[in-house]
Amino acid sequence: MTETSISGLRGPKSMYFMEIVDVSSQESSVLSSIVESFTSAVSASNLGVYSDEVLCDIKSSLKENSPITMLPNYNVSPTGDEHGQYLVIDLGGSTLRIAVVDISKPHPNLSRSERITIVVEKSWIIGNDFKRIDGEFFKYIGSKINEILMGQNVIDVKSVINTGITWSFPLETTDYNRGKIKHVSKGYTVGEDIYDKDLKMVLEDTLRQEYGLTLDVQSILNDSLAVYSAGCFIDSKMKLAMVLGTGINMCCSLKRSSDIHPSKMLADATLFNCELSLFGQNLCKDFATKYDIIIDKRFAGLSHHFKTFMEPDPITKTLFQPHELMTSGRYLPELTRLVVVDLIEAGEIFQNVDHQQMYQEYGGFSGELICFVHENDDYDDIHDKLCKAYGWTTVGLSDIVCLKEVVSCIIKRAAFIVANAIIAFFKLLGSDELGGDVTIGYVGSVLNYFHKYRRLIVEYVNSAEEAKGIKVDLKLIENSSIIGAAIGAAYHK
């Protein structure tokens, strides 16, 4: 195939796109087989079959009391009447955020979102050498709370301070505003003085002893539950909350049912942290490629020795997360890199440039780059982006066309898998809960920046027979960990 340098094509767009069509028509058999391996099972008609299989696993998790998926939490179903002033603490993996939020009373001239005012908000980076949750850590949090409260006049610091928390670590939940600190993640450890202590009591005692402040923790949520809390207040049509960034998760509210294990029902309605990443085992046979197997060899086990949604792998003692591995921002770039390396070896791409960086695991192709290539239809811009990323002076047009084809098929499969999960949850919720316009609230860098990925998910869902009579939209719930915690506190006050 004759190589064409894109640097010679900076002319009128009509001529330029004509040239692109000519190049793409020379698609290689290797590329064709790769595209086929990612997309052969992707069709709207298949959503019914595969969503039924995911639904079956979700129901098993609920019925058999899975300890790692469909985790129960106290329900938050805002009515829109919630109001008041709240202190919010949001502890994530590397950031502490503290805010004061004012939710005004319902007013005919104000939408629900317009009633929410973040009076003050400040964040602090938590360094790796400070990631020990002990008494001193809570004193540090207390000092930042005091700093925030002393710099505002919305909350009366001499009165009881209603507080909401977004806590991005596991808790042994004992009530809607109580949970024991036992296990952490994201590089943190727990001090002996805090282990098995109640988060509400530790925080309230620290602020009272150190600063004479009286906090009343009304609600404790994790990040996915906070999306649901904030989203349901802002949009009464919201039925699901989704996180899709470096990982994937969903959250939904379910009514009491004989199909749900009694231990998972905390009240007449329970909010479930679904841990969606652990589902999707049924998709391995028809959707997994050799590249997925390179990332996690368990994709090759068509008859797995365990249920991914019920327990860790008994052999490796690690979790297997099929949904996350095929859809999330951590793995989409690595899948792309692995395919590109195969095409390099086959002599199909990047033959006239230094491609050694492509051989670097989890670094040879960045998330920013896959997003740029997928979202951008200006081949000049993609050319310049690739040259800047890899230190090239030029890159062939056929290379760019091939790369876009690779990225497109990987994103197409990912969008189908996410849509399939949404359909499964629609079936779980049932027709009584759904109808007309339905909103799915979301957060996460992938859905926020991959606009075409997001649109493709919506198109798949809305074209499915199982979603007949429903029109789905994905809605970004901005600042959900702050707003959701405030709404949670207002709901339970």
Swiss-Prot record:
Reactions this protein catalyses: N-acetyl-D-glucosamine + ATP = N-acetyl-D-glucosamine 6-phosphate + ADP + H(+); D-mannose + ATP = D-mannose 6-phosphate + ADP + H(+); D-glucose + ATP = D-glucose 6-phosphate + ADP + H(+); D-glucosamine + ATP = D-glucosamine 6-phosphate + ADP + H(+)
UniProt-listed Enzyme Commission number(s): 2.7.1.59, 2.7.1.1
Entry keywords, A to Z: ATP-binding, Cell wall biogenesis/degradation, Cytoplasm, Glycolysis, Kinase, Mitochondrion, Nucleotide-binding, Nucleus, Transferase, Virulence
Protein name per the record: N-acetylglucosamine kinase 1
CDD domains per the UniProt record, alphabetical: ASKHA_NBD_HK
InterPro entries: ATPase_NBD (IPR043129), Hexokinase (IPR001312), Hexokinase_C (IPR022673), Hexokinase_N (IPR022672)
Cysteine pairings via disulfide bonds: none
Protein family membership: Belongs to the hexokinase family.
Function: Component of the N-acetylglucosamine catabolic cascade that phosphorylates N-acetylglucosamine (GlcNAc), and allows the unique ability to utilise GlcNAc as carbon source. Converts GlcNAc to GlcNAc-6-P. Also able to phosphorylate glucose, glucosamine (GlcN), and mannose. Galactose, fructose, N-acetylmannosamine (ManNAc), mannosamine (ManN), galactosamine (GalN), and N-acetylgalactosamine (GalNAc) are not phosphorylated by HXK1. GlcNAc metabolism is closely associated with virulence and morphogenesis, and is involved in the cell wall synthesis.
Region (Hexokinase large subdomain): 222-479
Hexokinase domain sequence ranges: 27-490
Record note on quaternary structure: Interacts with histone deacetylase SIR2 under filamentation-inducing conditions.
Phenotypic effect of disruption: Greatly retards the growth of cells using GlcNAc as the sole carbon source, increases resistance against farnesol, and attenuates the virulence in a mouse systemic infection model. Leads to derepression of opaque specific gene expression, as well as to constitutive filamentous growth and hyperfilamentation in filamentation-inducing conditions.
Upregulation: Expression is induced by N-acetylglucosamine (GlcNAc), by the alpha pheromone, and in filamentation-inducing media.
Keyword Cell wall biogenesis/degradation: yes
Pfam families named in the record: Hexokinase_1, Hexokinase_2
Any one GO molecular-function label of the UniProt entry: fructokinase activity
One Gene Ontology cellular component: nucleus
Compartment(s) of residence: Cytoplasm; Nucleus; Mitochondrion
